[in-house]
Amino acid sequence: MELQREQQGDKTVLTLPDDVTIYTVAELKEALSPLLHQGQVLELNLANVTEIDSAGLQLLLAAKKTALANGYPLHLVWHSYAVLELLELCQLSGFFGDPTLLPHAEHP
């Protein structure tokens, strides 16, 4: 799976697709894994995510834990409504430690 990747100084920004579910997480993990070991800050842009399930959430949790274990920060940015809703439902907003601001145009 080809993901939009942008280098911004000392960090890499990876934009996730609209579907982060059991049907796509294996491919997403394969694309994300090398970036977790590159030794620099990684941001996951979640603005495009319209569908996320427990498998997608597990991917985000595993990515965060791997980044922390490797000593490099991983930040979730531009949370979509679908992502915010799942994080709140599972009471995991605090785990990631990133501000969770909803873009103005995305309220239900």
Which residues fall in each region the model found?
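STAS-like cytosolic regulatory interaction modules
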Residues: 1-52, 62-108
